[in-house]
Structures are given as structure tokens and as C-alpha cells.
Amino acid sequence: MSIHISAKKGDIADKILLPGDPLRAKFIAENFLEDAVCFNEVRNMFGYTGTYKGHRVSVMGTGMGMPSISIYARELIVDYGVKTLIRVGTAGAIDPEVHVRELVLAQAAATNSNIIRNDFPEFDFPQIADFGLLDKAYHIAREMGVTTHVGNVLSSDVFYTNMPERNMVLGKLGVKAIEMEAAALYYLAAQHHVKALGIMTISDNLNDPTEDTTAEERQTTFTDMMKIGLETLIAND
């Protein structure tokens, strides 16, 4: 048991999907896992362990933002021995070539957060995905026929910004989308020598506000991302 997770040792698999929304974790467990058992309800941050195609995997919500995912991911790694973590979440497109319901695989994550700078104030430490996971996820997505973009994302501490034009400049530099967690997850993976990847479904297009999705759609309909995440988790077994 850790401070924020009530599971016992052995309750959590060494491979886990991390949606931000705990209800998306519940949806994944109920619709993709067999014999799923809930291992955490603390703060309603639901976590489940079951099997997917005969492989033991877990799924747990992380909440919104880098402070929240940093708490849960660290405890999963340090207290429960998780070795592979894949974030499955949503993002807003800023690259004009990226559209709603398409996928982004976060090759690297820029950030405006001070979480990493707190440790490295003199320079910028690059947050990068595990290449093996990235490569597997890309080929699985291609085989499934899912439109998928690979590139950098911005992990932002700010959801409602007063200067959106600054973010849009990044789109012109090839940054695919804005989200709020990947940089912190990648930094934790680097610290603890584990594997991490961010897979995001585009839920909003900041270049075209008419492209959007409902809260219910974000919770339950992004199944391609969920399947790709699960298939990537078990690809090494």
C-alpha cells in the first residue's frame, strides 16, 4: 500500500495503461479486460488489474496535470514495481495537419512546467518516449488503419491560457498537440529506468474550433487508442 493507492503488493501488473479520467479506466477494464478486479478506489482514482488476450495488465486513472500523474506514476513504479507505463489520453491539435479523432504518438514532450526545472534549473532536460514502445505502437496503429502522427507534444501546466498565440507558434514548428501529462511521465521513466509512452487521441482542434468532441465521447469512444495501448503493452510478452 502506498500513500495514494490502496493496492497490496502483487495486485498491480508490471504493465499499465494510464488514462487521465478514472471513468475511462473503468471503461477500459469493463470492455477490454477479462476477470478485472478493482485494486484502488482512493479519491475515486479507479485502478483495475485483469487479463488482455491472456496477458496480465493493469489500468488506472491519473487525474489531470503533471503534479497528479507524477504522484500516481511514481508510486506505481517505486511501490508496486511497474516497468511499462502507457498514457492514453486526449490532446488538442495545434499542427494544421492533425485533426480530431486522429492519434498522436508523443515522441518527445516539451513543457512550460517547472517540475523538471526544479531539478535542472540551468538547462532543459529532454523528455522522450521509449523508442521500443513508440515503434511498436506506430506499427500496430498502421496495421489497424488508424491515422497516426508521430512527433513532439507540449505538456502544459495551463489549460485556459491568456496567450494562445504562443502555443500556436509551436504548431508551426512541428509540435503536434498540447496535453498536460507526458513530460512528467517521461521524466519519471528516465529517473527510474522504466519504459513510458504517451498515446493521445485528438479531442479538440485549436486551429478549427468546429472540430470537437463531447465529454461522453472523450470518456468512452476513443477505443482505437485503447486497443493500440493494450496491444503495445503485450507486444514484448
Swiss-Prot record:
Which sites bind a purine D-ribonucleoside? Answer: 4, 179-181, 203-204
Gene Ontology CC annotations of this record:
cytosol
For this protein, the record's InterPro entries field holds: DeoD-type, Nucleoside_phosphorylase_CS, Nucleoside_phosphorylase_d, Nucleoside_phosphorylase_sf
Keyword Transferase part of the UniProt annotation: yes
At what residues does the UniProt record annotate the site feature described as Important for catalytic activity? 218
Tell me what reaction this enzyme catalyses.
a purine D-ribonucleoside + phosphate = a purine nucleobase + alpha-D-ribose 1-phosphate; a purine 2'-deoxy-D-ribonucleoside + phosphate = a purine nucleobase + 2-deoxy-alpha-D-ribose 1-phosphate
The record places the active site at 204
The biological process GO terms on file are: purine nucleoside catabolic process
Which residues are listed for phosphate binding in this entry?
20, 24, 43, 87-90
Q: Name one GO molecular function term.
A: purine-nucleoside phosphorylase activity
The EC number on file is: 2.4.2.1
Which terms are listed as keywords in the entry?
Glycosyltransferase, Transferase
- Record note on quaternary structure: Homohexamer; trimer of homodimers.
Family the UniProt entry places it in: Belongs to the PNP/UDP phosphorylase family.
Q: What does this protein do?
A: Catalyzes the reversible phosphorolytic breakdown of the N-glycosidic bond in the beta-(deoxy)ribonucleoside molecules, with the formation of the corresponding free purine bases and pentose-1-phosphate.
Q: What is this protein called?
A: Purine nucleoside phosphorylase DeoD-type
Which species is listed as the source? Streptococcus pyogenes serotype M4 (strain MGAS10750)
Q: Name the gene for this chain.
A: deoD
